């Protein structure tokens, strides 16, 4: 009888943990909203480019307007880390059958004290899954950006960017784009390119990104 009771308790605990996990998938509601918004914009008959990643992508509100000759979908979700993108890869990227995808992750990972090697491993898994699903897909890794509020982590961000760059050198159809140094004035961070929180960019900041990324977006 005691054994039966123990099994019952364990079973209830397992069900409770499982139910909690099902109810707390990070960003599930936000991702669903992103999908609904982009589904209403997406023309499946046209070539598609997807920009995805954390809030630096999400807040790029005029992304499509900057590239009017391309169909560009923005599936960025604020506060995300590379593991979150990996979890939602099907809905945020593969669903739209893109020929190119631009990824910005790693910024929040470093802030949350994840080591660069761990972020790189997750990024490699993202790339592997994307290439497995769409072998001809072109993938562009956008470097971690500098910012006022996270400037003290610059050493870790620079190490992460070097790892991204080396990964891109090793794999076909994978490019690395550096936005770090264009956002500096010499060795100093430009402070006129951020909004008041010191983390996210204003229009001038996105002007820099546009100039750096334009050739990758517009390349056939």
Set out the residue ranges of the language-model regions.
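Catalytic His-Asp segment of secreted/periplasmic serine-dependent ester chemistry enzymes
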Residues: 148-220
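A generic secondary-structure signal
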Residues: 37-40, 88-95, 129-130, 216
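Extracellular/periplasmic catalytic domains that process cell-envelope and extracellular macromolecules
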Residues: 42-45, 66-67, 95, 132-133, ...
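A short helix->loop->beta-strand "cap" motif at the edges of active sites that frequently abuts
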Residues: 134-138
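Conserved beta-strand scaffold positions in the cores of enzyme catalytic domains, especially
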Residues: 51, 72-74, 176
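Oxyanion-hole/transition-state-stabilizing segment in secreted/luminal serine hydrolases
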Residues: 56-66, 71-73, 82-120, 140, ...
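N-terminal secretory targeting modules
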Residues: 1-49, 61, 65, 220
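Charged helix-capping and loop-helix junction motifs
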Residues: 117-126, 156-161
